[in-house]
Amino acid sequence: MAKGLDVGTSFIVLSSEGESGTVEYKDFRDAFYVIKPTTPIASKMIEKGLVGKTFVKDTDGSYIILGKDAIEKAVERNDSAKRPMYRGVVSSKEKDARRVLSYILKEVAGKASKKGEKLVFCVPAQPVDQEDDDFDVGYHEDVVKKILEECSYDSRAINEAEALCYSELADDDYTGVALSWGAGMVNVCVMLSGEPVVKFSTTKSGDWVDRMAAVATGETDSVVQAEKEQGDFTIGRPSSDNQVLAAVSTYYDRLIDYTTKQLAVAMEGHKALPNFKDPLPVVVAGGTTKAKGFVAHFEKKLSENGFPLPVKEVRHASDPLHAVARGCLIASQIL
């Protein structure tokens, strides 16, 4: 049995083929929160309160809570959960990032059904809007491969937006443009007849919206994230009733404007771009694209900001939260 794994900044998604031939998914929030008890009694009470939740007890007696439970605990304490990843790769900002990512990946992927089981996972492309040395895809890929090797998988990495192309462009002869809007980055792939000809990323996405809205309103990132995911707002129409959602709507507008300008600059005159004879489908996926009005606003900004390729349509992936994981599974099945 082959598997696919979307190793995202905000979510880890495992895809596998079910008994009936359908694709099954396992989602896990890519987050952690540490509670350090002050007394032995507090330690016992905290552990009782964590029954049924996913956590690891650390060597110093603290509790590392994982997944959605980490977000809930952080919000309860008016704090922000942490992540082992930042902008699509293992975070250099968290000293425990590699260890926590190992806990999470092993929780999600589990042990291989047999030694050498095929698994394809996704990695981001090099960003076009960041020129420093903080972004290291190679190290990130090696870390993930090592963790999966410990689970007895034979793993291979592919580009995140390339995986989205495999998932969503089958009816378009695998020709078009795919954008995966994750929490940390936007990954872009231009594909021609199944060949990825241009791949790059930009470094602002859903997390940037949360951070800027948090700064504007004085809330924590986790509170903003929770309100954004549960709230009712439309991009470009700030709410007058909720200042957090009003800020989120405003920064979504800025994010889409920024990204479409980066797309135009990165692709204009790109030597690897073919001369496409027909207009191209543009597919968007990822949790950031779930906001109301996203597709229409993105299509409008593409046109306004001079996207250099002919566009047939802009459409949502059939399953925006799972499309990349599905593409990884498709790649794994043909290896």
Please annotate each region the language model reported:
Residues M1-D58, S62-A178, S193-T202, G206, ...:
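Nucleotide/phosphate-binding catalytic cleft detector across ATP-hydrolyzing
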